[in-house]
């Protein structure tokens, strides 16, 4: 195994070759984690944006199962599933299918278009330039984070994130956007393991087999993660499980990992030295 690969695996915490029995154990472990954290913080609810993708569908169902468990114990708790489209989402029916599977305590739709377009206009007025599609995509992700914290802020709920090992290693999230959350119940799982957990939870193939997409770009709606990364999730997952992958793919993945280190840390201070290495 490559030296950096071993280091990354220790950091990400992925267990190789997960079986269905182990997946069921992981479901239970993560439901209990959510319950324990809600009780420890005194919070009475959770908020999560639901896109219809694999990760938010899995995290959403785990949240609802945790909330159901606490309610059965007499501790009134709720899960608010938030739809956060920019205008009209091209795969809206997938999001609705995810909501039917999750069965959240309540759901609401917060369309971010007006906020993002207003920022777009203000940006042009301030800089004299048109915001790039990529930069605007990050604005969308951060607007969604703001919306979720606004929904959570009134009742004092916690915001749930969907980051997992296959996204963390690549830094494939927006800093202070979808990377902003109070708890990450999918940490330590890779993409195929997220799919496996959804399967053992009874999700339809339409949900667990959906091609992952951040869907942030106006110019390329629905562009897949794999196309954007130039790597496949099977390659990333194999690497995270300690398996050998194509040399060029491994080198590219490690380069992306090193380049995105700043996303996996708190803001750098004068006392930090990791960035010097």
Question: Where in this protein do the model-derived segments appear?
Answer:
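Intrinsic disorder and flexible/low-complexity segments
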Residues: 243-277
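Long, well-ordered amphipathic alpha-helical subdomains in the mid-to-C-terminal portions
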Residues: 213-251, 258
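ATP-dependent adenylation/nucleotidyltransferase module used to activate substrates
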Residues: 2-170
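A non-catalytic, amphipathic alpha-helix used as a structural packing/dimerization or gating element
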Residues: 25, 29-33, 189-200, 252
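Catalytic subdomain that performs nucleotidyl-dependent activation
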Residues: 78, 104, 136, 144, ...
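Generic alpha-helical structural signal
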Residues: 28-31, 96, 195, 233, ...
């Amino acid at each position: 195994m490559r030296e950096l690969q071993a280091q990354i695996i220790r950091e990400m915490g992925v267990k190789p070759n997960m079986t269905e029995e182990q997946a069921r154990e992981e479901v239970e472990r993560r439901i209990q984690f959510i319950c324990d954290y809600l009780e420890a913080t005194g919070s009475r609810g959770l908020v999560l944006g639901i896109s219809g993708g694999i990760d938010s569908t899995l995290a959403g169902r785990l949240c609802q199962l945790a909330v159901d468990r606490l309610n059965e114990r007499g501790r009134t708790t709720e899960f608010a599933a938030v739809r956060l489209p920019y205008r009209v989402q091209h795969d809206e029916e997938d999001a609705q299918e995810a909501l039917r599977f999750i069965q959240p305590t309540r759901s609401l739709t917060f369309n971010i278009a007006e906020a993002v377009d207003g920022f777009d206009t203000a940006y042009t007025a301030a800089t004299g330039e048109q915001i790039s599609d990529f930069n605007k995509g990050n604005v969308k992700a951060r607007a969604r984070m703001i919306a979720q914290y606004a929904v959570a802020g009134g009742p004092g709920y916690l915001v749930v994130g969907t980051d997992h090992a296959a996204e963390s290693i690549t830094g494939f999230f927006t800093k202070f956007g979808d990377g902003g959350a109070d708890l990450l119940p999918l940490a330590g799982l890779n993409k195929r393991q997220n799919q496996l957990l959804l399967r053992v939870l009874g999700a339809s193939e339409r949900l667990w087999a959906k091609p992952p997409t951040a869907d942030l770009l106006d110019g390329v709606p629905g562009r897949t993660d794999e196309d954007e990364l130039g790597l496949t999730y099977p390659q990333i997952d194999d690497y995270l499980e300690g398996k050998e992958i194509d040399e060029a793919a491994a080198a590219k993945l490690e380069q992306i990992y090193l380049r995105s280190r700043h996303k996996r840390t708190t803001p750098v201070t004068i006392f930090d030295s990791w960035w010097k290495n």
